[in-house]
UniProtKB/Swiss-Prot annotation:
Belongs to the glycosyl hydrolase 13 family. GlgB subfamily. CDD domains: AmyAc_Glg_BE, E_set_GBE_prok_N. InterPro entries: A-amylase/branching_C, Branching_enzy, GlgB, GlgB_N, GlgB_N_E_set_prok, Glyco_hydro_13_cat_dom, Glyco_hydro_13_N, Glyco_hydro_b. Catalyzes the formation of the alpha-1,6-glucosidic linkages in glycogen by scission of a 1,4-alpha-linked oligosaccharide from growing alpha-1,4-glucan chains and the subsequent attachment of the oligosaccharide to the alpha-1,6 position. The active site is at 401 (nucleophile), 454 (proton donor). Its EC number is 2.4.1.18. It catalyses: Transfers a segment of a (1->4)-alpha-D-glucan chain to a primary hydroxy group in a similar glucan chain. This is 1,4-alpha-glucan branching enzyme GlgB. Signal peptide: none annotated.
Length: 722
């Protein structure tokens, strides 16, 4: 390209390789510097020490300057602007590349697992100059520029260097707090809508959509003890009672505005810890423009939402949970992304992150786009994001949303709306390979962290290691258990005898996976009402049913999860636009449910038989699972030491069962350690107190207890040490 053509191309924002022309270069045997500064009247060159080295000639009226540069050292530009005022600027085009060749090679392979340390916007120092290093992947773009509040959002000012499809530039003087986006020209030369940074660490509050340069090192962590021991606390034999939270609607200020991350650290953390929960699960904390998506349509996967404060304040919240002994799980959405113009959709003018074929690239239910898991750089983006939350924010676990939609090519699609895989089947082989690799990387590179699958089908071995042929998750939500048992609880007690299999069926497959029992947010939205509202009977019976159900759940094999509000029997459907109905705690019935949940958590955590062998048949034993006529179930839970056991009995009718005999394996005294019918919880007070096992064989066991079963209640009994 001739010199005049190159100048015109720079001024028009069309130069294919701006670093080959702008900045310092050899020309006709001498060293020259070229710069494009729209609005500049004069430009002088200074040495690093401030000594004048000469003045550049204005060679284009739009602000292109060129001139000789004496010496080979550093230089700065002194700019006199047309409107008055003067600045001393570093020239971005004198600095070397941002990424190494090796980083680019690994990224192209899909194996640069922490590429977030290189792509995006990183405050940095180069050649003694402070600024920000920008890098973005857009392989099909003709030109990419950084635009922001530091350059009047003018894409001609800072076009980037293209290296293997990654565009990069170091901008001196740009630091934390600067707003920015990428201006991209597609292969045909058309300007696309300004794009937020896919790897951006912080973003404007909606309706603003710009990314914000941010320094993630501002928080000083104080959770070292937790991080050292978290592997044992997140292990399959540890208690795991999870409180699921939507941060925006847990509690609000009197004026209806959101609590900040720091306010949540002061209020939410002690609340969760005080109830005895071991973990909190946050609905997706990533940046999302549409609040009504609850975070499940994220645009900024690397940015905690700015609704509640800056990134360091989110770190403060996680830190506070850890110091209170509570682990943090984040919902994570690698299944799809929204079509917002500033997001990933057609990022460089092509279907870059998504499949071009809508039969593979568009989700018919949600109107969102599906990641192209077969592309190395897209897999790298997602795997790097998973590690980012575990590394940078000390997140303990990732609950992967909508896994079923990833596994099946025909998920929610009719005949002719999907494309079979290479073997003619409906399995999404690329998504399966991605999930397996993601889990291998998480478990291999983030010690003590874990993953959870929200997977609603019968796909086998979801929570089994990849070397065994599994998907590699640590845990899986037991959606079948949740649907069956809730359906059972909705039945009038007089009819439950005809649906007894719904309450027992889960034990047929309880040990096929490492299950979490989820009473999640999905069960209190979209017209389903509250958990309490789905219980039959009058008000007293509804509360009693709910208490009995919670007791049964805590006795059942599997880890525990309850969505916020369930702990005090929220009476209306969850509304993400307001806070929970905290005034209900003024009533004894709701307060009683909260006290029951706290006591269930305490019992669960203190009793190895209730959590130590959740995922093996040795941890569970039916005593009587077939008493459909009386709607009673009874079973034993055992610890690693089989002599350490708990007897759980649930009566799902409002009839007091006097003299109900239950077989037990050991003689001696037994104590009722928890009864959901306790008056402290709002119950009627039918109790057993101290019991002595009788030498009356029952249920195939040498001894038995003669119980009084309270109405609509679950009781826990265990041998009392003599």
């Amino acid at each position: 390209m001739r010199r005049e053509e190159a100048i015109r191309a720079v001024v028009a924002g069309d130069h294919p390789d701006p670093f080959s022309f702008l900045g310092p270069h050899e020309e006709a045997g001498r060293r020259v510097v070229r710069t494009f500064l729209p609005g500049a009247a004069r430009v002088r060159v200074l040495s690093a020490a401030g000594r004048p080295l000469g003045e550049l000639e204005r060679v284009h009226p739009e602000g292109f300057f060129s001139g000789p540069l004496s010496g080979n050292g550093r230089y700065r530009l002194r700019v006199l602007w047309e409107g008055g005022g003067e600045d001393e600027l570093e020239d971005p085009y004198r600095f070397p590349p941002v990424l190494s060749d090796y980083d680019l090679y690994l990224f192209g392979e899909g194996n640069n697992h922490r590429i977030y340390r290189h792509l995006g916007a990183h405050p940095a120092e180069m050649d003694g100059v402070c600024g920000t290093a920008f890098a973005v992947w857009a392989p099909n773009a003709r030109r990419v520029s950084v635009v922001g509040d530091f350059n009047l959002w003018d894409g001609r000012r800072h076009p980037m260097r293209n290296r293997n499809g990654v565009w990069e530039i170091f901008l001196p003087g740009v630091g934390p707090g600067a707003l920015y986006k990428y201006e991209i020209k597609d292969a045909g030369g058309s300007l696309l809508p300004l794009k937020a940074d896919p790897y951006g660490f912080f973003a404007e509050q909606y309706p603003g959509t710009a990314s914000i340069v941010w320094d993630l090192s501002r928080h000083r962590w104080e959770d070292g003890e937790w991080m050292e021991r978290r592997g044992s606390r997140n292990a399959p034999d540890a208690p795991m009672a999870i409180y699921e939270v939507h941060l925006g609607s847990w509690r609000r200020r009197p004026d209806g505005s959101h609590l900040t991350y720091r306010e949540l650290a002061e209020e939410l953390v002690p609340y969760v810890a005080g109830l005895g929960y071991t973990h909190v699960e946050l609905l997706p904390p990533m940046e999302h423009p549409f609040g009504g998506s609850w975070g499940y349509q994220p645009v900024g996967l690397f940015a905690p939402t700015s609704r509640f404060g800056p990134p360091e304040d989110f770190k403060h919240l996680v830190d506070a949970f850890h110091r209170a002994g509570v682990g943090v799980i984040a919902d994570w959405v690698p299944a799809h992304f929204p079509e917002d113009a500033h997001g990933l959709a057609r990022f460089d003018g092509t279907h870059l992150y998504e499949h071009a074929d809508p039969r593979k690239g568009r989700h018919p239910d949600w109107g969102t786009l599906i990641y192209n898991y077969g592309r190395n750089e897209v897999r790298n983006f997602l795997i790097s994001n998973a590690l980012f939350w575990l590394d940078e924010y000390h997140i303990d676990g990732l609950r992967v949303d909508a896994v079923a939609s990833m596994l099946y090519l025909d998920y929610s699609r009719k005949e002719g709306e999907w494309v079979p895989n290479e073997h003619g089947g409906n399995e999404n082989l690329e998504a399966i390979a991605f999930l397996r690799r993601m889990n291998e990387v998480v478990y291999g590179e983030a010690p003590g962290a874990f993953t959870v699958a929200e997977e609603s089908t019968a796909w086998p071995m979801v929570s089994r290691p990849t070397y065994m042929g599994g998907l590699g998750f640590g845990y899986k939500w037991n959606m079948g258990w949740m649907h069956d048992t809730l359906q059972y609880m909705k039945e009038d007690p007089v009819h439950r005898r005809y649906h007894h299999d719904r309450i027992t069926f889960g034990l047929l497959y309880a040990f096929n996976e490492n299950f979490i029992l989820p009473l999640s947010h999905d069960e209190v939205v979209h017209g389903k009402g509250s958990l309490l509202g789905r219980m039959p009977g009058d008000r007293w019976q509804r509360f009693a049913n709910l208490r009995a159900y919670y007791g049964f759940m805590y006795g059942h094999p599997g880890k525990q999860l309850l969505f916020m509000g369930g702990e005090f029997a929220q009476e209306r459907e969850w509304d993400s636009g307001s806070q929970l109905d905290w005034h209900l705690l003024e009533g004894g019935e709701n307060r009683g449910v909260r006290d029951l949940v706290a006591d269930l958590n305490a019992l669960y955590r203190a009793t190895p038989a209730l959590h130590q062998v959740d995922f093996e048949p040795e941890g569970f034993e039916w005593v009587e699972g077939g008493d459909a006529e009386q709607s009673v179930v009874s079973f034993l839970r055992r610890a690693r030491n089989p002599e350490d056991f708990v007897l759980v009995v649930s009566n799902f009718t409002p009839v007091v069962r006097h003299g109900y005999r239950v077989g037990v394996p050991a003689s001696g005294p037994y104590a009722e350690v928890l009864n959901t019918d306790d008056p402290r919880y709002g119950g009627s007070g039918v109790a057993n107190g101290e019991l002595e096992a009788e030498e009356v064989p029952w249920h195939g066991r040498p001894f038995s207890l003669r119980l009084t079963l309270p109405p609509l209640a679950t009781v826990f009994l265990r041998p009392r040490p003599v």
